[in-house]
């Protein structure tokens, strides 16, 4: 019987969001254990090699990371298989580049460049609010952070704006109707819209109804909803398309219009 952790990941079993060709070998890089789940993360190796094209091989990525050039959320990461996840900020100081990991409407991690000012903070979804030993209140975020003595108004499913350098909470956004959100799981992954209403189903999954800027409405589980702004103002910049998913016919019309303009 097998003992211990799994050390390999077959390429065919790797998440589709990594966009690995199935003829490129037998194995895929297995992410290290870290703040994000295997199916919800992107290894640093794939980000540098396949997305940014800064390296051709695994060996070259290791040489880059071992020079301590790559920072994730303000901390140097030398592990080439480190799991990057939703809202993580990747800094490459040598080239002066800053990236935020964010989904596109097709459910893939897009290369989203951000400014130096925006790279100083990130948004975190509150997963748990509890009281620890000696009555110390604390909360746990979606990326595994534990923050002690938070503002008592912050509840589960709210979003906090976290300053990366100091780990201080700058602001909080309530999970309320009318606030802007992004979907982080399910078939609507990557879509952006405003929360319309929520249905409570005790003993099952609460359902959240969302409307995007084009007027399309859809529903998803509460667990998949990540609040990213108050009202219609987003706290982070969004990738091209602003999280609006077009139908097949709308995509075709847009493509034909672009071709006609050329």
From Swiss-Prot:
GO terms for cellular component: cytosolic small ribosomal subunit. GO terms for molecular function: rRNA binding; structural constituent of ribosome. Disulfide bonds: none annotated. The keyword Secreted does not apply. Gene3D superfamilies: 2.30.30.30, 2.40.50.740, RNA-binding S4 domain. It comes from the Eukaryota. Keywords: Ribonucleoprotein, Ribosomal protein, RNA-binding, rRNA-binding. The keyword Transferase does not apply. GO terms for biological process: translation. Residues 42-104 form the S4 RNA-binding domain. InterPro entries: KOW, Rib_uL2_dom2, Ribosomal_eS4, Ribosomal_eS4_C, Ribosomal_eS4_central_region, Ribosomal_eS4_central_sf, Ribosomal_eS4_KOW, Ribosomal_eS4_N. PANTHER family: 30S/40S RIBOSOMAL PROTEIN S4 (PTHR11581), SMALL RIBOSOMAL SUBUNIT PROTEIN ES4 (PTHR11581:SF0). This is Small ribosomal subunit protein eS4. It comes from Lysiphlebus testaceipes (Greenbugs aphid parastoid). The lineage of its organism: Eukaryota, Metazoa, Ecdysozoa, Arthropoda, Hexapoda.
